[in-house]
Amino acid sequence: MAAASSTTATTAILAAVIISLAGAATTVDAKFRAMQWTPAHATFYGDETASETMGGACGYGNLYASGYGTDTAALSTTLFKDGYGCGTCYQMRCVGTASCYRGSPAITVTATNLCPPNWAEDPDRGGGGWCNPPRAHFDLSKPAFMRMADWRAGIVPVMYRRVPCARAGGLRFALQGNPYWLLAYVMNVAGAGDVGDMWVKAGGGGGWVRMSHNWGASYQAFAQLGGQALSFKVTSYTTGQTILAAGVTPASWCFGLTYQARVNFS
C-alpha cells in the first residue's frame, strides 16, 4: 500500500550535524501513560530495505539519521491528525490469523508517515481503502511487519495501543529557512511523542515568538532570528506538558543543521 512521501528536508537532515548544548526544563506533571488495546489492521509498504519509508509526511527525512530506523508506520488519516500524530508510538500484536507468528510477539513502531485514503475502494466490500476514515490503520515498514507476521499475508488483524515513546537524549531541532523565516522539524520526542505547540526566543532578552504548525512535525516563525542563540518551548499535543529547552543553539547556528537539547518529555 502506498504511503505519502516528501522530499522536503531530506537532504538537510541527511547532512545534519547534531550539536548538544545546555538546556533547562520546566514541566508540568502530565506524564503520558499507555492506552487500552484496540482492534485494527496492519499492512506494509516497500521492501526489506525499508527504503520507501525514508522521507515521509512527517518530514523526518532519512529515518536512520533522525534516529527512528525501520520500526516505523504510516498512519491512516484518523490517527495522523494533520501531522499532530507524527512521532507517536504504538505497540501492536498480530491476532486471529494463521499468519501471526507463534506467541503473538509485540512490536513497537513510531509514526513517521501518512497512509492516504483511497476513496475508490471500500474494504467492507472486499477492496482496498484500509486507510480511509474513520478507520485506524497502520501501514508498516516491511521489516516491522515481518517481526510479527508472515509478510505473504499482506494484511493482518492486530490489537494495538498507544504507548510512551522511549528516546535517548534530548529533543532535536532540524533548522531550515532563510533570514526572515525559520522552519524547525522537531524529532526524538519522548513521552507522548507528539508536538502541539511551540515557541522560539532569540538571545537572552526579548519575548517568545509563537510558531505555527507548517506540516508534519515542523513549526515555523516569520522572524529574523539569526546571529543569536535560540531557545524553544515545546508543548505536547496529547498531554499539554510543556518543556523549556534553553540555549539549544549557539549564536552562530546555521540552517541545514540539527541541534539537540538536553531536555525531553517524561
Swiss-Prot record:
Keyword Cell wall biogenesis/degradation applies: yes
InterPro entries in the cross-refs: Expan_Lol_pI, Expansin, Expansin/allergen_DPBB_dom, Expansin_CBD, Expansin_CBD_sf, RlpA-like_DPBB, RlpA-like_sf
Annotated GO biological process: plant-type cell wall loosening
Localization per record: Secreted, Cell wall; Membrane
Name of the gene this protein is made from: EXPA30
Expansin-like EG45 domain boundaries: 55-170
SMART domains: DPBB_1
Gene3D superfamilies: Expansin, cellulose-binding-like domain, RlpA-like domain
Protein name: Putative expansin-A30
Signal peptide start-end: 1-24
Keywords, comma-separated and alphabetical: Cell wall, Cell wall biogenesis/degradation, Membrane, Secreted, Signal
Residue span(s) of domain Expansin-like CBD: 180-261
Membrane topology designation: Peripheral membrane protein
Annotated GO CC locations: extracellular region; membrane
